[in-house]
């Protein structure tokens, strides 16, 4: 089974999530929650992570983490492994605690509102789960970073960074007035919950430019053993680029493909290049180049590989 590729680079921001094995609790009591936070603090000390938001639920957690050193993978391996060992030791258990590999969505953190969307989602998670009654303030749920945003600096852990989120809310200073304004805006956001624009789906949250930059990194890093939506999208983007490059060189537009024979030598040559340089299926290649049935394309490519491309067919 293909492993999911983890794209790491200095300054990357991720929304990290993981659930208990078989959706069972990963915290038996508040002592376990404190144990997890202590382990997270150690992980941040080792990795220099900066955490923008976190929330501990019964059988899963959310973490919005920035990695100045581009080291999400070793940090998460340490965090999950050490917490599992400590949990098992405390409860005299053994075996897996978490369900498979954690999910990590890339988040564009350059001030376009994406970091705010993710952190708001994390801080409002207890509301969606029914853990905060309608008459209670949001900070009454103590197992998230939100109450710490409303505290002064001495009460916060060093690894919690609040300035970025406050800035995206348009709050320039981490002051009593700024924190009061933040609380008011979050309560208003809570009342509007249900119309939010962010859901933790896919593999990244950001602008199209940000997505394309990530896909370029994936294209450079990916190996045949890698899997995941970002790898599939990177492969698709590469194949589309090659196909368009070939059409431009021939002076063809996409409709020209439909008007040419399915076995046109140039189509076969382009198909061979796509087959050689990408991981796209014969189905995709046949559809993109208007070459008909997959079996027909496979036969054409076999003949092409046996005789080799002629000088008239070779453009590059």
Model-predicted segments: where are they?
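Short Pro-Cys-Gly-centered "Cys-loop" motif that presents a nucleophilic cysteine in a tight turn
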Residues: 1-57, 66-316
């Amino acid at each position: 089974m293909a492993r999911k590729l983890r794209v790491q680079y200095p300054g990357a921001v991720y929304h990290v999530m993981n659930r208990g094995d078989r959706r069972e609790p990963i915290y038996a009591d508040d002592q376990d929650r404190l144990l997890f936070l202590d382990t997270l603090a150690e992980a941040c000390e080792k990795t220099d992570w900066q955490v923008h938001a976190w929330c501990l639920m019964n059988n899963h957690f959310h973490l919005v983490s920035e990695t100045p050193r581009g080291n999400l993978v070793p940090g998460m391996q340490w965090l999950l492994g050490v917490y599992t060992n400590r949990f098992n030791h405390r409860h005299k258990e053994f075996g897996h605690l978490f369900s498979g590999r954690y999910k990590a969505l890339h988040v564009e953190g350059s001030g376009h509102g994406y970091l705010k969307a993710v952190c708001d989602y994390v801080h409002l998670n207890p509301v969606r789960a029914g853990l905060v009654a309608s008459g209670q303030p949001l900070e009454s749920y103590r197992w998230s970073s939100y109450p710490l945003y409303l505290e002064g600096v001495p009460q916060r852990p060093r690894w919690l960074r609040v300035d970025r989120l406050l800035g995206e809310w348009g709050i320039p200073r981490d002051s009593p007035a700024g924190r009061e304004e933040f609380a008011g805006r979050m309560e208003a956001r809570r009342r509007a919950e249900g119309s939010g624009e962010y859901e933790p789906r896919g593999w990244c949250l950001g602008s199209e430019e940000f997505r394309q930059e990530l896909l370029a990194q994936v294209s450079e890093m990916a190996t045949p053993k890698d899997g995941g939506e970002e790898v599939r999208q990177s492969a698709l983007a590469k194949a589309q680029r090659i196909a368009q490059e070939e059409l431009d060189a021939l002076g063809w537009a996409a409709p020209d493909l439909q008007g040419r024979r399915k076995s046109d030598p140039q189509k076969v040559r382009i198909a061979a290049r796509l087959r050689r340089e990408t991981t796209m299926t014969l189905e995709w290649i046949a559809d993109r180049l208007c070459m008909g049935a997959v079996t027909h394309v496979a036969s054409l490519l076999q003949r092409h590989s046996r005789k080799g491309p002629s000088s008239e067919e070779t453009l590059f």
